[in-house]
Amino acid sequence: MENFIFHTELKSELNFLIENSHKLDGVLCFHGLAGCGKTTFAKYYSHLVSKEVHLYDASSHLFDKGSASNILKQINETGRSLSEFTDGGKYNADAFWNHCFIIDEWSNLSASRQNAYKVTLERVSKEMNALFILIINTSKECKIDKVLTSAILSRCQTVDFDIKAEHIDEVTELVKERYSMLDEEYIRKTLPDMRQIAKRAKLLS
């Protein structure tokens, strides 16, 4: 967790999820602006709490070849189909969850495709002891209830990764400590896009 630059409130929430992953119902949704660390943390978290991690990208060609229901059939066929999607195989043998399915760019799915998952998310989670992490981009103009259908939203425990106005000062100081080559004006102008900040720091290092 020390490798992430998150404000105290978010870090506390994420630590709680790490310590209590066994209490989750089976579907998490990480949301916020692009570049704020949702996908990177999802990968880190999934390796901690599950035996196998499987990463999907809803914007890739894999999701264009068939309907959402066909993709879910592939998820069900873990032994035969998931090997081509897994990001490296088995991890934590002592983890509570047998599988973690990360679906990045979930917000690219239409409402009808999202709703095709609503029953299967629950069923697969129970039958396979699987955790799903849905990752979506949200903003002030496009909030989570505008991105997720009500059926999917009601099945998710949501985590907001956004850096709000009250967090800017704290996060700015954390970034300055991590990337001393960056000036404060640039940091404040670029937040909350931590991806761009990291790229700039790498360029100047």
Summary of predicted features, one role per range:
Residues 4-8, 35, 187-194:
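Conserved phosphate/pyrophosphate-binding and hydrolysis machinery centered on Walker-type P-loop NTPases
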Residues 1-33, 74-77:
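Pre-Walker A (pre-P-loop) alpha-helix and adjacent loop at the N terminus of AAA/AAA+ ATPase modules
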Residues 16, 52-205:
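Non-catalytic interfacial helical region
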Residues 9, 37-40, 112:
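Generic alpha-helix structural propensity
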Residues 4, 14, 30, 39-42, ...:
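Conserved RecA-like P-loop NTPase ATPase core
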Residues 19, 25-60:
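Walker A/P-loop
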